[in-house]
Amino acid sequence: MGCLFSVNSKKVRIFDTTLRDGEQAPGIDLTVDQKIRVAKRLAELGVDVIEAGFPASSDGEFEATKKILSEIGDQVEVTGLSRSVKQDIDRTIDTGLSSIHIFIATSDIHLKYKLKMTREEVLNRIYESVRYAKDHGLIVEYSPEDATRSDEEFLLKAVKTAIDAGADRINIPDTVGVMHPFKFYDLISKIVKVTGDKIVSVHCHNDFGLATANSIAGVMAGARQVHVTVNGIGERAGNASLEEVVMSLKKLLGYDVGVRTYLLYEVSRYVAELTGVPVPYFKAIVGENAFGHEAGIHVHGVIENPMTYEPISPEEVGNFRRIALGKHSGIHGLKRLLEEQGIFLDDTQLREVLKEIKSLAEAGNKVTSADAKAIAIKVINKKITA
């Protein structure tokens, strides 16, 4: 199954920050070995950039970044986060990385309460830090933290300053998730106009549940890179979900994302297991119910042609189709489920089994395929002994 709607041959880069922004979520603390294992899975998945961590923040982060680079640095771009200060940049250089992600906030609230700096001082810091990193031969991505709450004129000035200093990419973070798609589209359109041939990236948080939608809007406005995390993990309400962004770009907009999508479910479960953060049951793409069906009309349609009630095939993302049993079930779904277990009933028997299943479900019981099989065997035996 190809693109569902329009086709666009342009490439969109996938920048995975599961190991940095994702791990910043409270309660997620991966060991160095676990971070390496996740990084290997991400490289296998085919993302373009892996943000391995924040090397200057701790000795553990420094060592993890070094080891990730040594393990997969020949397969994928590995980068590290850095504040716009010389000591952070030096620490990142010491890991052996050839790529760095430098940030400093541009919103007035951050300047006043966190940085205690003037706008002019911030612009000077941007130029000096980006230039310093470039002078050391690094690929530089610059992020104006809290960009979406920044004065627009000043934000554009900060972006231009980073470009003048030699930045290779400009990333626009919606740090506290206050954008909606229409507003973000307008902002990214303006950023793209002042960046020339530089890659514009977006980094969206999910505080209002719009991280994926905003990321897609950013790409539609001209961004050519998206920051994501596996399962959308991250601080507060999380980040844009890798699996949602990848499949939306590929199937709805026809972009080349370069990701082996058949590994999405597997990687999702792997990260969930290591972090201890479960995947929501109704999670798009990788949730247990993402391709689940119970209602009789839906199940009948899916059996005849899965596209009647599925926008993509579960196999494309490594997930599975699940036919559930309950008070909404119909005879077609039951027949398929039983036949998959080697049980073949006539219509009269099927109706009898279905009646008992619905009775159990309406009483609040969960009915499994094993339950259906047991009921079917009971119906068969009743006919034999009759």
Swiss-Prot record:
UniProt KW keywords: Acyltransferase, Amino-acid biosynthesis, Branched-chain amino acid biosynthesis, Leucine biosynthesis, Metal-binding, Transferase
CDD domains: DRE_TIM_IPMS
Chain's role: Catalyzes the condensation of the acetyl group of acetyl-CoA with 3-methyl-2-oxobutanoate (2-oxoisovalerate) to form 3-carboxy-3-hydroxy-4-methylpentanoate (2-isopropylmalate). Carries out the first step of the leucine biosynthesis pathway. Also displays a low citramalate synthase activity, using pyruvate as substrate, but is unable to use 2-oxoglutarate.
Disruption of the gene: reported phenotype: Cells lacking this gene exhibit very retarded growth in MM and the addition of isoleucine does not affect the growth of this mutant, whereas the addition of leucine appears to improve growth in MM.
Superkingdom: Archaea
EC number of the protein: 2.3.3.13
GO biological process, alphabetically ordered: L-leucine biosynthetic process
Cofactor(s) demanded: a divalent metal cation
Oligomer and partners: Homodimer.
Catalytic EC class: transferase
Lineage: Archaea, Thermoproteota, Thermoprotei, Sulfolobales, Sulfolobaceae
Annotated binding of a divalent metal cation, by residue: D21, H203, H205, N239
Species for this entry: Sulfolobus acidocaldarius (strain ATCC 33909 / DSM 639 / JCM 8929 / NBRC 15157 / NCIMB 11770)
Reaction(s) catalysed by this chain's protein: 3-methyl-2-oxobutanoate + acetyl-CoA + H2O = (2S)-2-isopropylmalate + CoA + H(+)
Record InterPro entries: 2-IPM_HCS-like, AIPM/Hcit_synth_CS, Aldolase_TIM, IPMS, LEU1_arch, LeuA/HCS_post-cat, PYR_CT
Domain Pyruvate carboxyltransferase: 12-265
A GO term for molecular function: 2-isopropylmalate synthase activity
Pathway assigned in UniProt: Amino-acid biosynthesis; L-leucine biosynthesis; L-leucine from 3-methyl-2-oxobutanoate: step 1/4
Entry's family note: Belongs to the alpha-IPM synthase/homocitrate synthase family.
Stated regulation of activity: Is not inhibited by leucine.
Keyword Acyltransferase part of the UniProt annotation: yes
SUPFAM superfamilies, sorted: Aldolase
Name the UniProt record assigns to this protein: 2-isopropylmalate synthase
Gene3D superfamilies for the chain: 1.10.238.260, Aldolase class I
